[in-house]
Amino acid sequence: MASSSGDSVTRRSVASQFFTQEEGPSIDGMTTSERVVDLLNQAALITNDSKITVLKQVQELIINKDPTLLDNFLDEIIAFQADKSIEVRKFVIGFIEEACKRDIELLLKLIANLNMLLRDENVNVVKKAILTMTQLYKVALQWMVKSRVISDLQEACWDMVSSMAGEIILLLDSDNDGIRTHAIKFVEGLIVTLSPRMADSEVPRRQEHDISLDRIPRDHPYIQYNVLWEEGKAAVEQLLKFMVHPAISSINLTTALGSLANIARQRPMFMSEVIQAYETLHANLPPTLAKSQVSSVRKNLKLHLLSVLKHPASLEFQAQITTLLVDLGTPQAEIARNMPSSKDSRKRPRDDTDSTLKKMKLEPNLGEDDEDKDLEPGPSGTSKASAQISGQSDTDITAEFLQPLLTPDNVANLVLISMVYLPETMPASFQAIYTPVESAGTEAQIKHLARLMATQMTAAGLGPGVEQTKQCKEEPKEEKVVKPESVLIKRRLSVQGQAISVVGSQSTMSPLEEEVPQAKRRPEPIIPVTQPRLAGAGGRKKIFRLSDVLKPLTDAQVEAMKLGAVKRILRAEKAVACSGAAQVRIKILASLVTQFDSGFKAEVLSFILEDVRARLDLAFAWLYQEYNAYLAAGTSGTLDKYEDCLICLLSGLQEKPDQKDGIFTKVVLEAPLITESALEVIRKYCEDESRAYLGMSTLGDLIFKRPSRQFQYLHVLLDLSSHEKDRVRSQALLFIKRMYEKEQLREYVEKFALNYLQLLVHPNPPSVLFGADKDTEVAAPWTEETVKQCLYLYLALLPQNHKLIHELAAVYTEAIADIKRTVLRVIEQPIRGMGMNSPELLLLVENCPKGAETLVTRCLHSLTDKVPPSPELVKRVRDLYHKRLPDVRFLIPVLNGLEKKEVIQALPKLIKLNPIVVKEVFNRLLGTQHGEGNSALSPLNPGELLIALHNIDSVKCDMKSIIKATNLCFAERNVYTSEVLAVVMQQLMEQSPLPMLLMRTVIQSLTMYPRLGGFVMNILARLIMKQVWKYPKVWEGFIKCCQRTKPQSFQVILQLPPQQLGAVFDKCPELREPLLAHVRSFTPHQQAHIPNSIMTILEATGKQEPEVKEAPSGPLEEDDLEPLALALAPAPAPAPAPAPAPAPAPRPPQDLIGLRLAQEKALKRQLEEEQKQKPTGIGAPAACVSSTPSVPAAARAGPTPAEEVMEYREEGPECETPAIFISMDDDSGLAETTLLDSSLEGPLPKEAAAVGSSSKDERSPQNLSHAVEEALKTSSPETREPESKGNS
């Protein structure tokens, strides 16, 4: 008790002396260094909370009182970073911060330790490390800037600092809320540091002397201004991205709001991004927040907006900030109080500039005169330039696009539509945050609404702003990403090197490693020197009596004495080693244990296995002694004892967890004889997945080093090739393939593989497959696993010996169905390993055995799945198909190698196959096996394939199969673009006779690509000239197409002869009234040119069918179109409404007819030229189609095959039918009357309005292509206004 009280008095005196005497030695005459030593010793022994108090005293002494001692005691204090106490580890982090602030050169030694503490398992330690890095990053950057000559150690140190900063940014995704909060504050400080301080930047008092980007010289030899600026902007993006995360917590969101406000005030160049982030948050509050948390977030958002509003740089964003504050329920009076005064905005730049100049004078070493000249433009100019660089954001562009569209009618419609999706009861969260809308309908409120909607659309990746930004930033992004990656890679490598130097051994690999503090050494155990045993005291002489010596011992005593003697010899290992008699001891033990029973052997074995590496000599001595005893016995000797010794050693080694040094292999290879039982132990060792490689390496060594029994060892390895464990089997196959390369082993391995392969011919798997330890009935059926057991070795050898493929074909023909299916599943990879140029594989294809057709086909598919077939393979398959096996399925794998004529001849047979097979055929022909639309290797381009399907004779193939095949083509939208389909329809229309499926294809093409409407109208008009009514099925489709494209098809219907026009009305009487209304909308001058026979049919009722003149039997001439063209000629234009330009004069009828004929000829000529220039069928006339638009899902889906031979059905709803107008003149009044109300047909597309408003020059023959292209493009906002008027 006295001593303990004395210790406490001593400790109290040291502590009190520290606080009372700042100068001079202590009361006991101790120097400061001695006091530090004493305190450190106390800290090492204390385990309670007072350890922190003692360590803080040490810190005060060596940092504040006598900094010269800092380097001396640095290692001793840093050693406490491994302390179990969390508070002690946090103290070490704080000590590192204070030490580096006192002497920045210490950062070279301490940064690696701080890096380790940043990865501590305790959350509080990590948070303390993040706080320390917030300060040390600025200190380290300032240190690097001041150093004009950078050493390798400084580079490595800065690389690790930068890497740690990147890791802390990644901690924004941590699972812990506290860590994320500290990471947010670190990112805030990083952004302020890595961005230039402007004239109007707010500078907190504590940060007046902190470094920022504007203080870094642009010509610094190591620190690159532009790289740091890019990292700062990237940190801003990370923080903004984190804040809008939908699962962000309330505390993180509150912290992020405050950080963004600080960034906006201190770095006004980011004001725009901050305001936009606040708008996004206001419109998209995280759904995970509770009601109280929502209120808290909104309150914080209001406070931060008010603080930002006070800043002079917020003048440009006052409208947005004010609107947000009003939405958050802020009174106008409070907003007015926080408005920045003009006086402040005038005064502040001057004050800040002066303060900046003062700071530059206080720190002249940061840059030289010539460096300051680079920064002459001043902070204010940089601020404006940086503000202009950013330009409009995605939200701004989308908001400007939406604002003119927010008319009262449109807003009312949006409200009505959204009413359907509203919940029946008002959510409590909405009720809590709802504030009445003030000044509704004003321009400011509309602008705010547009920004709210733009924010939602931008967050969803929609709107013109997102699209424009993507297009503008694609190329710059690619250029900017390259350099930072190289920098980051460099830093990662250097950080890894430092980490290794910290945790590695004490060997000095580089100067940097010497300076990094090493981990404390663990004390090595002191081995006590064994004392020699003293002889018993027997000083008194005794009379020798024989009876005393010859007392008999019991058997137990004898055994105990022998066992004791052996144990003493075993324990004397170290003492004998010192005396130099180790080999004698080993011989004695080996001789003794060979003569003793199993009990003694177990003791020696246990002793050996305790430290196999050190006692391996004893094991081998024992093993060879047992073998010598067997040899000495001659013919009467047995191997039992030797075998027991070897098995015990191998089994004991097998139970050892760590065998990386190959002791097992050494015992096996140096054993004089490997018995059957020992071989079984080796086999079990190989079956251990963790030791399979080592065990099989041992077997391989036995095979090569013991040739007398190499086939016995090889057989064990071959048995393992069909093992049920994948890892064991794969290792065995790997070693066997190496053995197969040896000539002396090749025949045995091959024979073994073929024997296993021949087992597949048996009706049931033989018992050899199940192993000796498994009791399985011989009559068990084949399973996939047992089949694979017979194939593993064979398939592994097949790529090395291609001749084996013929054996597989022979077995395949005799195997049962289940075996065949398994063979087909596993043959793919080995066949690919052989390659399509293998002579043996080509021979198999040429001499395909009967019954192996499926196998050969599977091989062909595996070879040609990803690469085109070789000419030699195509030749063999062609010969096989034409000469021996006329099964069209053989041609499928080599379709891309056949001639176009051969593919067309085989099409009728191919499309009658199973639907899955037909799909594979089309995938190969269209090049879409792997999701790509590339038919460059196909003998048929997509257009030729579709035309060939239309030309298939219905006698050779039923129409239902042809329709299904065409549907497969239409399902490939990436291949069958609008250009391809236009060329297909053009060529089909020019055929004679017309294909039966022509109109079905036209309707499907129009459904897929509504922009083909104008081209389809031309097709219909030319079909009239070819007397389409002579082809009943095509005529039926013609009428269907006209019915679905009304009112645009009215111009085509009016070109029909009277009799055919009457037939149209018979089948579709609903067309009569709209067509009659269309004609009556013509001017009197135009109606005068309508033939009376046509008008009679139009005006006739169902009861009166007038007699009409029979249509001419020959093909229609161009003169026959004259009456209709005259009817459609423009009449004198009525007095137009006041407009910028008068309407053009009407064109004479003769000019109109000439125009019509010129259009037809120009269109045909252009189609022919396009077809010649692009023989692959990819292109199409520019006058017909333009870029393919996005199509609704209903139109995108593949066509549904019809049940009847001809059924003209659209693939989507009828409202998707395009309403495309073909104008024949310039009369605007005619255009308006032709654009009928499209409510029955779906919304009027923009193409109609575009064509309707096109000019006379655009419709001239030479400008036909340009006019149609412009009609197919999306209409501009100016064109949208007359369209809306026409619809209304």
Swiss-Prot record:
Polar residues composition-biased segments: 380-392
Positions of the UniProt region annotated as Disordered: 335-392, 1130-1151, 1163-1288
A Gene Ontology BP annotation from the UniProt entry: mRNA processing
List of residues that carry Phosphoserine: 13, 494, 1238-1239, 1260, 1276
Modified residues (Phosphothreonine): 1274
Region annotation Interaction with HSF1: where it falls in the sequence: 1-124
Pfam family, one: SYMPK_PTA1_N
InterPro entries (alphabetical): ARM-like, ARM-type_fold, Symplekin/Pta1, Symplekin/Pta1_N, Symplekin_C
Motif Nuclear localization signal positions after renumbering to this chain: 345-360
Subunit-level organization: Found in a heat-sensitive complex at least composed of several cleavage and polyadenylation specific and cleavage stimulation factors. Interacts with CPSF2, CPSF3 and CSTF2. Interacts (via N-terminus) with HSF1; this interaction is direct and occurs upon heat shock. Interacts with SSU72.
Free-text comment on this protein's domains from its UniProt entry: The HEAT repeats have been determined based on 3D-structure analysis of the D.melanogaster ortholog and are not detected by sequence-based prediction programs.
Protein name per Swiss-Prot or TrEMBL: Symplekin
Biological source species: Mus musculus
Lineage of the organism: Eukaryota, Metazoa, Chordata, Craniata, Vertebrata
